[in-house]
Amino acid sequence: MEMKLPGQEGFEASSAPRNIPSGELDSNPDPGTGPSPDGPSDTESKELGVPKDPLLFIQLNELLGWPQALEWRETGSSSASLLLDMGEMPSITLSTHLHHRWVLFEEKLEVAAGRWSAPHVPTLALPSLQKLRSLLAEGLVLLDCPAQSLLELVEQVTRVESLSPELRGQLQALLLQRPQHYNQTTGTRPCWGSTHPRKASDNEEAPLREQCQNPLRQKLPPGAEAGTVLAGELGFLAQPLGAFVRLRNPVVLGSLTEVSLPSRFFCLLLGPCMLGKGYHEMGRAAAVLLSDPQFQWSVRRASNLHDLLAALDAFLEEVTVLPPGRWDPTARIPPPKCLPSQHKRLPSQQREIRGPAVPRLTSAEDRHRHGPHAHSPELQRTGRLFGGLIQDVRRKVPWYPSDFLDALHLQCFSAVLYIYLATVTNAITFGGLLGDATDGAQGVLESFLGTAVAGAAFCLMAGQPLTILSSTGPVLVFERLLFSFSRDYSLDYLPFRLWVGIWVATFCLVLVATEASVLVRYFTRFTEEGFCALISLIFIYDAVGKMLNLTHTYPIQKPGSSAYGCLCQYPGPGGNESQWIRTRPKDRDDIVSMDLGLINASLLPPPECTRQGGHPRGPGCHTVPDIAFFSLLLFLTSFFFAMALKCVKTSRFFPSVVRKGLSDFSSVLAILLGCGLDAFLGLATPKLMVPREFKPTLPGRGWLVSPFGANPWWWSVAAALPALLLSILIFMDQQITAVILNRMEYRLQKGAGFHLDLFCVAVLMLLTSALGLPWYVSATVISLAHMDSLRRESRACAPGERPNFLGIREQRLTGLVVFILTGASIFLAPVLKFIPMPVLYGIFLYMGVAALSSIQFTNRVKLLLMPAKHQPDLLLLRHVPLTRVHLFTAIQLACLGLLWIIKSTPAAIIFPLMLLGLVGVRKALERVFSPQELLWLDELMPEEERSIPEKGLEPEHSFSGSDSEDSELMYQPKAPEINISVN
């Protein structure tokens, strides 16, 4: 029997709600453009043009000791931004009480331990859902209820024909009883009377201080709403009483909820005593229903009882039933690492609920929509000269003021610290290598100055200011080859290099004018991973190589080694210093003659020898045998400490704020730890060397390079040939890095600037060539580290929920400050000289390992060493045979090995062509692998994307709901796959 209030029809909605302030309603009648009930991310909601529905918090309360000591206890629940309170009212005979709450996942109050349990996935009994449906079908349904207080709301839901005035008064007094929350003191605190309610005062309507200061409030996002579910057994009720209310405007219902939030929903489930936990389980079922995003989306738009029941039926169709005896219902299922997508549930909901539909996308289309450059407006040809450059400028100018204002955040400070140290280390490392490769024509000072000038200019004018310019391994290889060529043909190196730079700038400008950057659409994951793996291996190789070189500078002293002998000579009548000099080195360790005044220094250390008036003699007197081992200790300490601190963010230790701080400043803390350890022991480890004088490394040359010098004029024309190869290298290096940084899964809002970036690099090539400074291009690893240090994640995270990736903090200031500090480092030598070089080498190793471990290529290499039964459940292994996966990985390994061999041999002059050849190899793979396999192993090229329907991929992967695994994982929102530890 449906119970209605007198005059209920006056406020029961006949259409979708109109007064929801969060704007959930769809004003567009077009069913193809409506909001999605999924709402897994704010970004998707913005793409659809509607706000996201609020999160749902659910709280379960229990009444103890009725009627002598009326007291409510919370048992609770919450889901993303709707707060629900569920009060459970047992009868006189019920003395036990349960405490639960849901903040996206269920938490149970451990009464004995006095704490909340770990969040877990709630499980329900199927009969409780069926009984709940029956009770709601026969109960009271009020939509757009105008109640403005708890008293008005209680009067509305209890004004039913089946209740006598006396029972109605008792029930109202019970519902108006102030609940006893977990964080409050015990004792009965009645709200508004005992048997008959009275008008509430302003103080009684105001939320309590405990509600406003509840720590749980910080875990709920702004705009969160509350819903209340009251369920329980009352002996004085003769028949069940059910009511579901949706308030027209959200209202704060006094101290009813644990957290002070405006309430939107109210559900009442009462009835006479029954065996078991019938109403308790029905209350849990109602709370779980309201925490479900699909049900919540439907009930917000429901216009009558039929819509409400249809939403519940849709939920029942999605329920998974576990057979009895095969699963313990009391077992707690831990939260998944990544929440499943709701897209696969759309078809069933669209069949049941009248409302805006969501257009269906095939998984293939969606995969490319989230690809690195699919449908990117920056990569569309305009057909005009410099058309792409003009479009990039027009696109970036409106964002220019915000590029500086968005940097006013503490996170940017930590990013500056780490990227500055990484940039300085890179400048010193590559400056030293460049000095060795060019016999001092360029050195550390030129590296510092060039990094500061080129990097700062690029950050101010580039289309993607998050890019960090630096010397790179491939460009260094080309510089070495160019210097060797100049020396072999007796050419003046810097003037010849100037003409090469002029030609490179010219070729790059031609590429900009002809919009050649649109060719990056052919740079698929195969090319990106090959290049990224090569750069990461260069970082690892250089870090380990530099560390091993320290063992030559500071050799390890082995016991009994004759090369490190040390004797103490005492002046005396028989002492003959000339005899020591004439003694062969191999025989000096055997000389322990008092006639010569010599004593083995192992018995008398050199400082003691000097104090007693002797003279230490021998090559081992001034050798500190611990430097090599201690440098290795600093190297490994900085590496492992940075890795450990980065992993703290996802660990169980410390509060979330502390974990995030340690993770953000992991590299800086690792460097400080290494410096402190070095200062504590006081060993003479090699320190960071910063130039102290502002003058060119090569004596006798000025800051401007003469165009000709001693070279014949025709060499200025011949320089075009090596410049062509270098242009290919610059284009590939710059654009591959740009493609990686501008992938759509990074959720960049300000757009890319492929043409503008290449134009800036061309101008800087001309400037650095004229000043005799190193050439600079986008540094893949450091740029990725820069972006990773600026990751934005949601602050409000429910217990058990991982922070949602929101995007990157896009701005220009961090890079600009980094390069200004790099230039000023020449004047910071008194401070920087205390940083040990092994510590910086450890950070270099850390960056290379983190970048290498974050790409899919590395995971596929691991599969080569795993038996099939121990392999992880990767999505690609469900759709591609394992032998085909191994074949694809083997081809990538062969290409990577070939690139490394060519880079390390005199044939490195063709290294740029080999990078370009990666695109050709990927194109040839279309003859070896099917489009279906390439779709999962790599990405399809533009021609393959257009032919997807023709090749039959769409029917196989179409989103039909039957293949739940594909549908869920294909639409799974993911953060960028880079895990480079930065600050």
Swiss-Prot record:
Q: Which InterPro entries does this entry report, sorted A to Z?
A: Band3_cytoplasmic_dom, HCO3_transpt-like_TM_dom, HCO3_transpt_euk, Na/HCO3_transpt, PTrfase/Anion_transptr
Keywords per UniProt: Anion exchange, Antiport, Cell membrane, Glycoprotein, Ion transport, Membrane, Transmembrane, Transmembrane helix, Transport
Q: Where do the record's region annotations for Membrane (anion exchange) lie?
A: 415-983
Compartment list: Basolateral cell membrane
Q: Basic and acidic residues bias: where?
A: 946-957
Residues of the signal peptide: none
Which GO molecular function entries does the Swiss-Prot or TrEMBL record give? Answer: chloride:bicarbonate antiporter activity; sodium,bicarbonate:chloride antiporter activity; sodium:bicarbonate symporter activity
DNA-binding listed as a keyword? no
Question: Which sites does the entry annotate for glycosylation?
Answer: 183, 576, 600, 979
* GO annotation, biological process: bicarbonate transport; regulation of intracellular pH; saliva secretion; sodium ion transmembrane transport; transmembrane transport
The keyword Glycoprotein is assigned to this record: yes
Q: Where is this region: Disordered?
A: 1-48, 186-205, 332-357, 946-983
Record Pfam families: Band_3_cyto, HCO3_cotransp
Annotated catalysed reactions: 2 hydrogencarbonate(out) + chloride(in) + Na(+)(out) = 2 hydrogencarbonate(in) + chloride(out) + Na(+)(in); K(+)(in) + 2 hydrogencarbonate(in) + chloride(out) = K(+)(out) + 2 hydrogencarbonate(out) + chloride(in); Li(+)(in) + 2 hydrogencarbonate(in) + chloride(out) = Li(+)(out) + 2 hydrogencarbonate(out) + chloride(in); Rb(+)(in) + 2 hydrogencarbonate(in) + chloride(out) = Rb(+)(out) + 2 hydrogencarbonate(out) + chloride(in)
**UniProt xrefs under SUPFAM superfamilies:** Phoshotransferase/anion transport protein
Q: State the tissue distribution.
A: Kidney specific.
Cellular component terms (Gene Ontology): apical part of cell; basolateral plasma membrane; plasma membrane
Q: Which residues cross the membrane?
A: 415-435, 443-463, 500-520, 530-550, 624-644, 665-685, 712-732, 758-778, 815-835, 837-857, 899-919
> How is the protein disposed in the membrane?
Multi-pass membrane protein
Q: What is its main location?
A: membrane
To which protein family does this belong?
Belongs to the anion exchanger (TC 2.A.31) family.
Q: What does this protein do?
A: Electroneutral Cl(-)/HCO3(-) antiporter that favors chloride ion entry and efflux of hydrogencarbonate and sodium ion across the basolateral membrane and may participate in salivary secretion. Also mediates Cl(-)/HCO3(-) exchange activity in the presence of K(+) as well as Cs(+), Li(+), and Rb(+). Does not contribute to Cl(-)/HCO3(-) exchanger in the apical membrane of the upper villous epithelium.
- Show the PANTHER family listed in the entry: ANION EXCHANGE PROTEIN, ANION EXCHANGE PROTEIN 4
The protein in question is named Anion exchange protein 4
Species of provenance: Homo sapiens
